[in-house]
């Protein structure tokens, strides 16, 4: 789109007192100062252009509620951004931002802030003043720590910090008591603070691709948790605390070093999906057959030699993966190749013969 065409669009939108304007996918490298004429705009989308900066005049659009600037080449934000005090949603993901101006703290009505895929190595303490923020996406940046003030964002419901360089979480992190979704995949975490127990509303917790070998006992207090992913860590045994998370429906522990499972695993009676692939499991406890709601189970790439006949009592199991267990003799390879139903039929027959 040429600058002349853009000016015509702006002039027409101003004349019509437009409230919504989409300028996505137009290879725009700049915006003219005339953008400030669109005083009635509440929604502006500039997705997927080539903007490297914003004119200060854009900050005169004081009625804006939603502003999309994702997939551009922005390396900084104008200080005047603080004037967009009615903004509720601000999308800046997939840019080149290396820092945020402290003035961003004045966007007091902001509910959703998306900053993933930038080059942020730190956050301004002032970010803590965004007290209405419920969604914050900071994944795929270069954050190695969080400011203590960060924990004052007490209304956060969803927080994404995956693909950063975090090696620890501050104890203050526990003040996010309203969090329901937390993603910390692909960091450098070797432990979690006991204060994690105070995430009393947490439903989903992603901790894959870290350096965890244990969990704090306090994690057992996350009674609302339904989804827990711990893939690609350093667990050699299943932390017993996990077995007290009775509302878990999905648990993923692939690519660890588990050699056995505790009998207490049967307490996870609501489990629907369980991924234990790529571990070193040589057997499963008899109590495993009590996971009556299990429908999807991946045990591939382990060291299993046999499955107990009682395994056939998993009446809801529809998908079972046993490939690449080189020592598995019961069920034999030719049965395993036929799939889940054949495996369960084989084990059922063995159970009947046993009984």
Spell out what each predicted region is:
Residues 1-47, 52, 56-71, 75-94, ...:
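The feature captures the LRR N-terminal capping module
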Residues 300-301, 323:
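Hydrophobic secondary-structure block in the mid-to-C-terminal portion of proteins
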Residues 307:
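Acidic, glycine-rich calcium-binding repeat modules characteristic of RTX/beta-roll
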